Each structure stands twice: as C-alpha cells, then as structure tokens.
Amino acid sequence: MSPPPGTAPHPEPTALPFRRIALVLSGGGALGAYEVGVLKVVERIRLVPSLVSGVSIGAINAVAWLAAGRDVRPIEQVWLTARAESLGVQWVSLTLRVIGALTASLALLEVVLGLAGSRELSGAYWLWRKGSAHIDLVSTQLDLALWIVLALAGGLTALYARRVARDLDRRSQGVDPVGLRARLKRVALAATAVHLVVWVMGWPWPQRFSASVVLLLLLAWLASTPGHVGRWLRSLALGLMPETSGRGLWSGRARRRILERIVVQGDRRALAGPGTGLVVSALAIDTGLIGHFVSWPDPDPVFAEKLSHELGEVLPVPDANTMISAAVASSAIPGLFQPERVLGRDFVDAGGFSNQPLHVAIAHGADAMLVVLLTPSSSPALSSPPADVVSLGGRLLELANWRDLQTELRHLPASWTEAGPASRVCVVAPREPLPASLLSFDPGRAATLIALG
C-alpha cells in the first residue's frame, strides 16, 4: 500500500528478535503530548508495530498517527496549536450559557411572582378597590421577615449539615416514594389554595414569599410525577446544560473535526479493513464492558474469548468514520464530555478502568510491547499531602494508573517474565509527574511535553 501524497513513506522495520510488537498508548488528557515525543522516537528508529492500542487521548493519538501514515508531523502540529477551546473545552461558552439560562429563568420567575405575588394585581384591588399603604407596608415587612428566617435556616443547615443529614437519613428510612409524592401534592395544593384566597381578598400577607413557596412546591410535585409533564420538566432542567442535553458539559464535535481533518489528508484505509492493526477501547454504558473496537474484519474467536474473560468485548468497525467515533468515545471523560454513540450504543472514556490494556496486545498474539504511560510507573511516592481538590484528583489518577499497570504486569505470560536475551516489555514513562494537568491544553506546555517524551 503506497502512502498518500504529502506523507512520509513507511520506514523499514527495525531488526528486533520479535515478530509482533504492540504499541500501547495510555490516557491522560493534555498529558498526551508526551506520547507525540515518544512517537517521534519510534519513527526515528524505524519501528513499525503490528498492533497499536489506544485509550482516551492515546486513542486520539493512535488514530491520527496511523491515518497520517505513521508520520508524526501532522499530530505534532495539532498539539502545538491546540488550546482547550479548540478541543471542545469551552469554559467561556459554558459560563455564558449558564448565565443566560439563569438570567432567563430568574426573569420568568420574577414575571410569575409579579403576577401571583402582587397585591396591586389581586382581585380585591381591581374588583373592590380595597387596600391601603398600611397593607402594602405590612406585606413587605412580612416578606422581609420570612426571607430572613429562611436565610438563617439555610445557614444553620449548612453549619450543622452532618447532623441534619443524619436526621434526614433516619427519617427517610422506609419512606414510600409514591406516598411521599402524594403528600407533596396535598401540601402544594393546600398552599396554593391559601395563597389564592389571601391574594383575592387582599389581606396583609407575605405575598412574594408565599408565591415563591407555592411555585416551588408545584414545580417539585409536577417534576416528580411519572407522566408527560414530569418528564418534560425533568428534560427542561437537564436541557440547561450546554450542548449535550444534560449528559455532559461539552460534546465531542471538536475532537471529531480534528481527527477528520487528519484522516482526509491521510489514508482512511489505515483505520479499517484487512491488514490493519488498531484497537481503540471505550466503556460501554449499557453493559459496563470495555468495548475494544478493532480495525480488521472477522476477529479471531480465541482473541474475543480472551478479552471476554477480562470483562471486554470485541467490536469490529466497518469503516474509518466508525473508528473516528470510537476514538471520540474513548476520550469522552464522563461528566465533562457527553457519551458518544458508536454502532448504536453509548460509550465513554475507559481510562478510569483500563488505562493501559496490555492484555489486549497479548490476546492478539504480541510477543513484545512498547507501553507509553503519562504518569510515573514506579511506586508513586508522595512528597507532600494534596493541598486541594485538584491536586488530590491528580494524585488519585496517578495511583489508579499505577495500580492498573501493576495488575496488567502481574498477568503477563510466564515466558515474558523469564530471563532472556531481550526484554519483552518496554515501559516508557516520565520519572516525575508531568508539568501539566488533565485539561491544561496549551501550545507551550505541549512543546515541553513533546520534548520530554
């Protein structure tokens, strides 16, 4: 197969005492620029792996590298110009959408409260012209007093949150959801009736506070119902989330565009079809299994059975577009990016469960492998306790990757661990944590990470 115009020709394989060398690229978000540096070395020594397996950002790099004819230059150019916004991490867009949604919601709430909580619009005022400044003053004072009481109650709840949580947990034991919904309905209707009577009569009353409580009770009850209105309200609340209808903060469109641009300029045939060797792993939401998307048709049943024992499933892709979707799904960090639909099913990033799937390469028949990690592979010593949530999250990711690697290494075939003329597993990993975080996409940091790789 001749390389496409504009790409470097395939180098001759390096002479090594192995027949089938696998390249495993792990996940780690913006740290994935480190893998580009490793791929530059792989290209320089003319190493041509028979299998490339990628997870999360490793899947993105794997698909882009193979589609570019194993030429690192297009991928390096993407990394050296990539920022969080260009990869779909749209913090400004998210902020504007949230502000817009909150502004619209509060404005509509004020309209409702202006109609339902105003004595000037009550039946008593318009039908009987009954009322006085004294009634207005009393209503305003009652409103203010009740809002102050509510603020104090909220502050005390936050102050004694543990005690309140224990009390709620004790009271909620054995609660019937259907009965609770029925009681909520009765309370909401009773509060509505009281508010309407007072509103029509024009009596001194905390009008806006009362209208707020009634509105919240009615919305809570309607949202808890199983019917069409309840489903609509729940979907409306989820719809306030940007781009993804509540299944994540951002979509995968930006990552898809980057891969499609590289594939269009490269060779689509490298991503799907006979003679290819690409595996992209993602977590299936419906079954909880790790879906291993393979680029070749009719995978070996023995290969599929071995992965089934590791709670995985083999999913052959019919074309390059499906493999691109698989890579987008593999890099869809749960909670941040929405799940990606591939072959009619939803998948997300599998890095938290299997970040360096060595067993996939072994099951495929590899007799040696090059494993690229984005965190130190040695026992992760802790210099100081994590100072905040972000550093704690980074520490937990480091530990999860380290534990996953140790588990994979302990399941290597016995012949791989015996002394021999050459090591069968080469682990490439930074000696210290890399100077970047999961979402810190930046050209300067990327250049540093590529140099370290």
Task: Map each language-model feature to its residues.
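Patatin-like phospholipase
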Residues: 4, 16, 20-22, 29-253, ...
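Conserved catalytic block of serine-dependent lipid acyl chemistry
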Residues: 23-28, 58, 243-250, 259, ...
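Amphipathic coiled-coil/heptad-repeat helices and related helical stalk/stem segments
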Residues: 6-8, 35, 255, 353-357
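A short alpha-helix-loop-beta-strand transition element characteristic
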Residues: 263-279
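Short acidic, glycine/proline-rich loop/turn micro-motifs
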Residues: 65, 383, 436-440
